[in-house]
């Protein structure tokens, strides 16, 4: 991942003085401590975007005066704006996120067919009580879900970093108690194909004609770059999905592969869940304003109460059982008997127009905040 370099503050910081420095600089305690767990000679300031370079000060007053203009605000374009991402733009955004909020941990959990990194963003809590996983862009033409998830993450990080933010105490509680795992773009090759066309990937449109048929562009494309639907790839009654559905060959949508977990993107997501065994999973898709929450009775009893809370804050309709198998959420519930939810954002035809973004975001952000309450 390319590194965005913001400024560093040269400062000798001992463990005993951390609380006092955080208070004087107006930074949330949890965010400050998690950002400065290892650094002893430089201060890392979550919620600030400092100019490049190493800056030295003789007093806390000088430091306060210097950093004041660089504090991030909820009204800032980077926090409150609407952004669209392909895989390269997402990589740059993750670098900016890490620089602005150093308590975030960013790693690569696998690679796509075309060797594009699949990133996970994590928070490591002070007291690990819960683990929650969020993902987006399993399907290529549902890339708007990445935009929604990243915008919400910025609001969470800012709220944790700045005590004057309305949701500060809620965000601090999440940082202190919850291990968050976020995969913002499961299908980077597919997103790049939909957004930029095959030439951007070094491929020709002729290669996709047998898979894509009569369509003039790639707006209908859901699958990965090999024409496998990643959300039909998981070993939860996969055979039913394979035998009852067309196509039986690679396609722009629907094809579940010749067997489960043939695709590197699906393997990466399965391995992540097997390693982490999350308490709760939220998969963002489009569209329909619905929440799928059960799978053949394998879901825990608490799911019924949780989805009622999601409905109350978002207005989305809960649906317990769906005539569908082999999805990531299906497999997660089947494998672990833990809470899993597919949230279908917005209304209309994929890919949803960005004209809907504000409406989608307002409903989804409330659901995501609620999802982090365990």
Identify the function of each model-found stretch.
Residues 2-10, 27-65:
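Extracellular LysM carbohydrate-binding repeats and other cell-envelope/extracellular binding modules
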Residues 17, 21, 77-85, 138-139, ...:
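Second-shell loop/turn segments in exported
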Residues 55-118:
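Short glycine- and acidic-rich boundary segments immediately preceding or forming the N-terminal edge
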Residues 116-118, 125-131:
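Proline/glycine-enriched tight loop/beta-turn segments at coil->beta junctions
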Residues 144, 151-153, 157-292:
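Active-site/substrate-binding loop(s) of hydrolase catalytic cores
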Residues 237-374:
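Metallocarboxypeptidase
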């Amino acid at each position: 991942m390319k590194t965005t370099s913001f400024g560093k503050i040269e400062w000798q910081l001992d463990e005993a003085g951390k609380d006092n420095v955080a208070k004087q600089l107006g930074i949330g305690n949890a965010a400050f401590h998690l950002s400065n767990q290892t650094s002893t000679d430089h201060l890392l300031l979550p919620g600030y975007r400092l100019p490049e370079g190493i800056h030295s000060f003789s007093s806390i007053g000088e430091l306060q005066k210097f950093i004041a203009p660089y504090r991030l605000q909820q009204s800032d374009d980077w926090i409150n704006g609407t952004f669209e991402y392909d895989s390269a733009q997402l990589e740059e955004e993750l670098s900016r996120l890490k620089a602005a909020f150093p308590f975030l941990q960013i790693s690569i959990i696998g690679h796509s067919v075309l060797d594009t990194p699949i990133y996970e963003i994590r928070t490591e809590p002070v007291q690990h009580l819960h683990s929650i996983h969020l993902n987006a862009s399993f399907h290529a033409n549902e890339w708007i879900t990445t935009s929604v998830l990243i915008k919400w993450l910025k609001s969470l990080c800012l709220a944790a970093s700045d005590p004057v933010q309305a949701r500060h105490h809620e965000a601090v509680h999440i940082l202190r108690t919850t291990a968050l795992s976020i995969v913002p773009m499961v299908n980077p090759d597919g997103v790049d194909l939909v957004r930029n066309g095959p030439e951007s990937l070094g491929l020709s449109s002729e290669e996709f004609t047998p898979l894509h048929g009569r369509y003039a562009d790639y707006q209908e494309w859901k699958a990965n770059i090999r024409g496998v639907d990643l959300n039909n790839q998981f070993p939860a009654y996969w055979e039913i999905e394979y035998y009852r559905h067309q196509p039986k060959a690679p396609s722009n949508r629907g094809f579940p592969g010749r067997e489960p977990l043939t695709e590197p993107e699906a393997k990466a997501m399965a391995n992540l869940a097997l390693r982490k065994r999350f308490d709760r999973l939220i998969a963002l898709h489009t569209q329909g304003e619905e929440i799928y929450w059960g799978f053949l009775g394998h879901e825990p009893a608490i799911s019924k109460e949780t989805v009622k809370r999601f409905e109350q804050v978002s207005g989305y309709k809960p649906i317990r059982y769906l005539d569908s198998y082999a999805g990531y959420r299906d497999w997660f519930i089947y494998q672990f008997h833990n809470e899993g939810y597919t949230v279908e954002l917005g209304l209309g035809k994929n890919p949803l127009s960005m004209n809907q973004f504000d409406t989608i975001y307002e409903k989804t952000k409330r659901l995501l905040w609620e999802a982090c309450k365990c």
